[in-house]
From Swiss-Prot:
GO-annotated biological processes: mRNA processing; RNA splicing; tRNA processing
Keywords on record: Chloroplast, mRNA processing, Plastid, RNA-binding, tRNA processing
Name by which UniProt lists this protein: Maturase K
Domain of life: Eukaryota
Gene name tied to this protein: matK
Lineage, opening ranks: Eukaryota, Viridiplantae, Streptophyta, Embryophyta, Tracheophyta
Record function comment: Usually encoded in the trnK tRNA gene intron. Probably assists in splicing its own and other chloroplast group II introns.
Cellular component GO terms, alphabetical: chloroplast
GO molecular function, one term: RNA binding
Similarity section: Belongs to the intron maturase 2 family. MatK subfamily.
Pfam families linked to this entry: Intron_maturas2 (PF01348), MatK_N (PF01824)
Compartment list: Plastid, Chloroplast
Major place of residence: plastid
Length: 512
């Protein structure tokens, strides 16, 4: 690790983008496999080794020696002769996998220095701990969404041709051999079983190399968003000064904790907000939301801007139906596991001027956040807590654990969901989810003891409910009693609490 840090400092001082020689350094492979290579050296054959032993010191050293002695990297990536010119001849898939994992570490180096330079210029961003919570975005919506009228739901298109990705990364990686090697890996993935497609496009799957796939995806999204921001800035009458670079914003919301691991976070957790006087832009989980107070014609223009941008710059055909434009008053939109909507409350006010009295009708917009019950039950069904109809079932995989362990696991799941969905406007759905988890826990315990649920619940008594009715820990939060009349402030079902300790989406809420 110390050698790696020294190389980074040398790289930073000289500003020479020579990444390719790092492939011949053993410690890079240790970082790629997330463990050291100083353990005992096995002498078994590769076929008899597990995954942990396959990435051992002996295999890595032999691989480096072979790369020194022979020219394993055949650069030709032509569609016609690619089958004859594959990395390492494809005789050893293990070598290709080890090299690709190490290469995914290496290509992140230029981005790490980009991140460091951003933090050195604006160190106060790292001090904004409260804004690291993803729940902090909902009060932002609540304060601004009342003045907005239209929302555009954009599904970011992919896959993309490998050559377009290589051209995009040329601005960041100026080491020609590294670009050639990246091209080889992209074509390898396009021709492999999990990535194969008729048009030989690269799909951002995480089956082959999760780290490299996420790095390429973030680079692709960063490129098209940079172009979008440039177009938006030029089209605005006022010069926008409220947006920052993606790297800085990702750190701003606490998505990157280490300088070495740059732009490799799961894109399901990536969150970025672009704001000016007229529109708000949010990207989350492979989707984008464009909310504006402009007219429907303006939103349609931006829709075709997106389509032309993907077609002309990335050679992607994005069907128009992948971009939906709606009025905020007429629909709800899914964001960070919540179903959000704007509801209009009509009220009648009686006014009197001198001897004349009249009725005046006013409308007040209210920002609603509810739990998408159908999607959440679908997530619970995938985890075997219930069926698709919401009927609780026993979780057989936990039946071998102790009773206290089973109850603690179910209670933890229930508390985490209650904590994450503390900002929902209606708590009745949460009560139903708690009921499903409580009865699923009872069925699991009854299955373990070969008893019925009724008999088991009678035996446990009220103590069984403690794990599911335990109070939330007191943490710093946003609490908005002003959103409700005074008579409702004491009603727990109407309180919305946004916690400041939530830095990622709940696994069950992440159902898309």
């Amino acid at each position: 690790m110390e050698k790696f840090k020294r190389y980074l400092e040398t790289f930073r001082s000289e500003q020479k983008y020579f990444l390719y020689p790092l492939l011949f350094q053993e410690y890079i492979y240790a970082l790629g496999h997330d463990h050291g290579l100083n353990g005992p050296i096995p002498y078994e054959s590769i076929e008899n080794l597990g995954y942990g032993d396959k990435s051992s010191s002996l295999i890595v050293k032999r691989l480096i020696i072979r790369m020194h002695k022979q020219n394993h990297f055949l650069i030709s990536c032509n569609e016609n002769d690619f089958q004859q010119n594959r990395l390492l001849g494809r005789k050893n898939n293990l070598d290709s996998k080890i090299i690709s994992e190490a290469f995914s570490i290496i290509v992140e180096i230029p981005f790490s220095f980009q991140l460091v330079s951003c933090l050195e210029k604006k160190r106060e961003i790292a001090k904004s701990h409260n804004l690291r919570s993803i729940h902090s975005i909902f009060p932002f919506f609540e304060d601004n969404i009342f003045y907005l009228y239209h929302i555009s739901d954009v599904l970011i298109p992919y896959p993309i041709h490998p050559e377009i990705l290589v051209q995009t990364l040329r601005y960041w990686i100026q080491d020609v051999p590294s670009l050639h090697l990246l091209r080889i890996f992209l074509y390898e993935y396009c021709h492999s079983g999990s990535f194969i497609s008729k048009k030989k496009f690269f799909s951002f799957s995480k089956k082959e190399n999760e780290r490299l796939s996420l790095f390429i995806y973030n680079s692709y999204v960063y490129e098209w968003e940079s172009i979008f921001l440039f177009i938006r800035k030029q089209s605005s009458h006022l010069r926008s000064i409220s947006w920052e670079a993606l790297l800085e914003r990702v750190h701003f919301y606490g998505k990157i904790e280490h300088l070495v691991v740059v732009l490799c976070n799961d894109f399901q957790k990536a969150l970025w907000v672009f704001k000016d006087c007229f529109m708000h832009y949010v990207r989350y989980q492979g989707k984008s939301l464009l909310i504006s107070k402009g007219t429907d014609l303006l939103m349609k223009k931006w829709k075709y801007h997106f389509i032309y941008l993907w077609q002309c710059n990335f050679h992607l055909w994005s069907q128009p139906h992948r971009i939906h434009i709606n009025q905020l008053d007429n629909r709800s939109f899914h964001f960070l596991g919540y179903a959000s909507s704007v509801r209009i409350n009509l009220s009648v006010v009686k006014s009197q001027i001198l001897e004349n009295s009249f009725l005046m009708e006013t409308s007040v917009k209210k920002f609603e956040t509810t739990v998408p019950i159908i999607s959440l039950i679908g997530s619970l069904s995938k985890e075997k807590f219930c069926n698709l109809s919401g009927h609780p079932t026993s979780k057989a995989i936990w039946a071998d654990s102790s009773d206290s362990d089973i109850m603690e696991r179910f209670g933890r799941v229930c508390r985490n969901l209650s904590h994450y969905y503390s900002g929902c406007s209606k708590k009745q759905i949460l009560y139903r989810i708690k009921y499903i988890l409580r009865l699923s826990c009872a069925r699991t315990l009854a299955r373990k003891h070969k008893s019925t649920v009724r008999v088991f619940l009678k035996r446990l008594g009220s103590g069984f409910l403690k794990e599911f009715l335990a109070e939330e820990e007191q943490v710093l939060s946003f609490f908005f009693p002003r959103s409700y009349p005074t008579s409702y402030r004491s009603n727990k079902d109407k309180e919305r609490i946004w916690y400041l300790d939530i830095t990622h989406t709940n696994d069950l809420a992440n159902h898309e």
